[in-house]
Design a protein with these regions (language model features):
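Beta-barrel outer-membrane channel/assembly domains of diderm bacteria
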Residues: 2-110, 138-151, 175-179, 223, ...
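Solvent-exposed loop/turn segments at secondary-structure junctions
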Residues: 31, 72-76, 116-119, 156-158
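Extracytoplasmic loops and strand-loop junctions of Gram-negative outer membrane beta-barrel proteins
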Residues: 36-39, 81-83, 122-123, 154, ...
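Flexible, surface-exposed loop regions and adjacent strand-edge segments
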Residues: 42-48, 83-88, 127-133, 201-206, ...
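Short, solvent-exposed loop/turn segments at secondary-structure junctions
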Residues: 76-79, 119-122, 286
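Short, well-structured alpha-helical patches and their helix-loop capping segments
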Residues: 92, 128-132, 163, 284-287, ...
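Signature for the C-terminal beta-barrel architecture of outer-membrane proteins
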Residues: 103-110, 118-272, 279, 320, ...
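C-terminal hydrophobic structural anchor segments
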Residues: 270-323
Length: 332
């Protein structure tokens, strides 16, 4: 006879009728034409892709907020893009975010669920985490004057045989240097637990490896204990709003190919055009490849090169963007 024991803690949020005035709604839609010329492949690739997201915020009390967002999805951890094909299939919609935010005090918040990434990333850096990645777990955000901190406990899989945890701590300082300049700097530790006990086939959303080194059994060769230094300076350059940014990572659990960085500049030109340039070099085991930027170098690690962004707001709610990647895959 098998014996099954189960324990659960259940949080129920009850509400009466909800009207439109009770909800803070947000929506975005993006169409993207994508052209890829990979010298390692015989053919170029052309794709038409869409991403749409619909979210809502409900304030249950002065201290408790509920956030829900649905998005197009292909079971991809780091992308909400849907590729338009000729199969006339229906696009998938998934739960992109669903979390509670509770104000423990004036300067301390608790987040629980599948949440918006709570960690500071200079100029929305995607060196470690893709912008579409929404972690699942528990997080605290704290502020005290010019000091801020973020603490997270992220879960990757509910199966006890494949459980991987990400424990994270970020401490930072934000300072208004003068009327035109603001600086923000942080140091973070992202500690993945037991990744090197598994192969990508049981960890990543599609079972593929994203640039990290593997051992003879097909498991990850190294675990990942990441040290991350981030810097962002907002100022004025020739009367134009400018942002300088630097993001660096080192995996102390790897013996080699353990470092990565990106650095760049963002300029707002004539109140309309926005131009961003960055250079990135991300070695094979500097970070967990399945979570880093899914577009740079085709996704994953072991890439270096340039990225150019040019954005023009046609109206307040409609913009046109051009992004150019000139990347090289490192040979090992």
């Amino acid at each position: 006879m098998n014996k099954v024991t189960r324990a659960a803690v259940i949080l129920c949020l009850f509400s009466g009728p909800v009207t439109a005035e009770d909800l803070d709604l947000n929506f975005d839609f993006r169409f993207r034409y994508e052209y890829t010329d990979d010298s390692g492949k015989a053919d170029t690739r052309n794709r038409n892709r869409i991403r749409t997201r619909l979210g809502a915020k409900y304030s249950a009390s002065e201290k408790l907020d509920l956030f829900v967002r649905f998005a197009t999805a292909e079971e991809n951890t780091t992308s909400g893009n849907q590729t338009l094909g000729t199969g006339f299939t229906v696009s998938d919609i998934g739960m992109d975010q669903m979390y509670l935010k509770y104000d423990l005090s004036k300067n301390t918040d608790l987040l629980f669920g599948k949440m918006k990434n709570p960690f500071f990333k200079p100029n929305k850096s995607e060196l470690i985490f893709d912008g579409d990645y929404n972690p699942k777990g528990l997080a605290f955000t704290l502020k005290h004057g010019e000091i801020f901190s973020n603490i997270g406990y992220i879960k990757f899989d509910e199966n006890p045989l494949q459980t991987i945890d990400l424990r994270s701590l970020q401490v930072g300082w934000s300072k208004n240097i003068n009327d035109l300049t603001k600086a923000k700097i942080s140091f973070a530790i992202y500690d993945f637990d037991k990744l090197n006990e598994f192969s990508p086939s049981v960890i990543t959303f599609n079972g593929k490896n994203f640039g990290n080194s593997l051992d003879d059994n097909g498991n990850y060769l190294y675990d990942f204990s990441l040290k991350n230094l981030s810097l962002e300076i907002k100022t004025s350059l020739m009367s134009m709003p400018a942002t300088f940014f630097l993001d660096m990572v080192k995996n102390s659990d790897a013996d080699q190919n353990d470092s990565g960085f990106q650095s760049g500049l963002s300029l707002v030109i004539s109140d309309k055009w926005k131009f961003t340039y960055l250079y990135k070099d991300i070695e094979s085991d500097s970070t967990f490849g399945a979570l880093t930027h899914s577009d740079f170098g085709g996704g994953g690690t072991n890439h270096k090169g340039h990225q150019f962004n040019l954005s023009y707001p046609v109206t307040k709610r409609f913009s046109v963007d051009v992004v150019w990647f000139d990347n090289k895959k490192k040979m090992t």
